[in-house]
Amino acid sequence: VFRTAEALLNYMEACYEKNGTLDADARKYWMQLRERAGVSTDIDATIAATDLSKEKDFGVYSGTSMVDVTLYNIRRERMNELFSEGQRFADLIHWRSFDRMITAKWIPEGVNFWDNLYLLYDADIKADGTSDAVVSGKEQGNYLRPYSRNLESSNELRDGYNWHEAYYLYPIGISDIRTASADRDINNSNIYQNINWPTTA
């Protein structure tokens, strides 16, 4: 079952990807979504106000290239509209938005704490990188890094997440590959393993 909003978002994205511009229907659908949500229907103002260099969203990228501001705003509209419906990961896979993590790790960051927010807390807040630290230190940047607060730990996520090309597709089970072979030999199977995944269990 499709939500009407998702069908409209799909049309908007497909229209823009195909034509490089929004047709009258795509613009109308976008304004309808925003009107129903109680948000300004001036999509051109939203697009003009977007600075991609300030966006930390994975949706800014297709592969390792930044998309343009209109396509990004369509993606952001999708993210907001389908919030908490379990679609975001599939969208990011569809757009190949994790490619930059193949060559460089991504470190999750939270709130901008070290500009001014820290002033609202006790002066003795522990941020020294030890096991007693409650937040990541200022030397790591202004934004809190939840997995980097304890620099003494062997936490594998401390230095960030990485991604592998294989993760864009799920592996096919070896038993399924064998089942599709008359002699149960994976080399004679009608089903092939997805790229970058092994054929041994």
Can you say where each PLM-predicted feature lies in the sequence?
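Acidic/polar-rich alpha-helix caps and helix-coil junctions
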Residues: 1-201
